[in-house]
Curated annotation (Swiss-Prot):
Cellular location(s): Cell membrane; Cell junction, Gap junction
Listed PROSITE patterns: CONNEXINS_1 (PS00407), CONNEXINS_2 (PS00408)
Name assigned to this protein: Gap junction alpha-4 protein
Entries under PANTHER family matching the protein: CONNEXIN, GAP JUNCTION ALPHA-4 PROTEIN
Low complexity: bias regions: 317-333
Keywords attached to this entry: Cell junction, Cell membrane, Gap junction, Membrane, Transmembrane, Transmembrane helix
UniProt keyword Chloroplast present: no
Amino acid sequence: MGDWGFLEKLLDQVQEHSTVVGKIWLTVLFIFRILILGLAGESVWGDEQSDFECNTAQPGCTNVCYDQAFPISHIRYWVLQFLFVSTPTLVYLGHVIYLSRREERLRQKEGELRALPAKDPRVERALASIERQMAKISVAEDGHLRIRGALMGTYVASVLCKSVLEAGFLYGQWRLYGWTMEPVFVCQRSPCPYLVDCFVSRPTEKTIFIIFMLVVGLISLVLNLLELAYLLCRCLSRGVRARQRQDAPPAPGTSSEPYADQVFFYLPMSEGPSSPPCPTYNGLSSSEQNWANLTTEERLASSRAPLFLDPPPQTGRKSPSRPSSSASKKQYV
C-alpha cells in the first residue's frame, strides 16, 4: 500500500476542485478500490498460479493452460483499470495546478507594476492586459478555482474519458473471464496430448470478489454519468440566467446604452414670444395705466371732504394756524 501513497495525495487534491458527485466518485475509488484491492486482493489471488493444477504430467501443459485460463491476472487487470480510470483525473489536476500557478504569477506581476511610481502608458496597458487574463481565471473567495471556462471543458472531458474507460474495462472483464469463476477449466492446447482438466483454488471466494469489483465498477460508471448530467444542467442554467439578464428591460430612468438619445422640452431664448402681446388701454402699457389710475384715485380722495373730524386736542396756547370758528362752521355747512 505504500506504493499508492503518492497517487492518493494527488487524487486528494483533485477532491478540492471537484463537484459533489465527483467527490463521491473519489470516495468510492479510495475505499472500495484502493483499500479493498490492497488489503484483500493479494490474499485472495496470491495462490492463483501456484494452486492451479491440471491432471497431466506433460511438461509445460499446466503453464499453457494457465495462460489460456487467465490471459491477465484479475488483480493486475483491476490495477490497470484503476490507473487508466485515474489518468483523466490527473490530467485535470495538472490543468488546475497550471491555472493556480499562472494566477499567482499574474498577481505578482500586477503588484510589481502597481508599485511603480510613474504612470507610464505602457504600464497601464500591461495592467489592463493582466486584468483581462485574470478575469478568465475564476477564483473563489477561499482561493480555490471555480469550474468555469477552459477548466470546465477539461473537467467535462475528464469525466467523459472516465466513463468510456470504465465501460470499456467492464466489457473487457466480461469478455475475458465472465462474471463467475468456474472451479474446473477444460484445456486443449499444445503441448497437452488431450483434453486436460485444470482446477482453480477457492473459486467461490474469487467469484464473490469478482462480483464485488463488478458492482464497484458499475457504481463508478453511474456516478460518472450522473456527474455529466449535473454539469450539463449547470451549464444550461448559467446560460439561461445570462440570457435572462440580457433580455431583461432596463429599470425606469435608466438606459441600456451609455449615451442614449433622449428628448427634452426647452423654451427658445433667442426668438420672440409666439403669442401676441396683451392689449393696452388707451395706447398705454399696463404699468403706465396702473400709475394713471392710482393718480386719479389720489386726486379724488384729496378733493373729497371728510364727514367727521375729531376735535383738536386742548392745549395751553392757541395754535396760530387754527381756522376761525366762523370758517369752520362754513366748512361743515
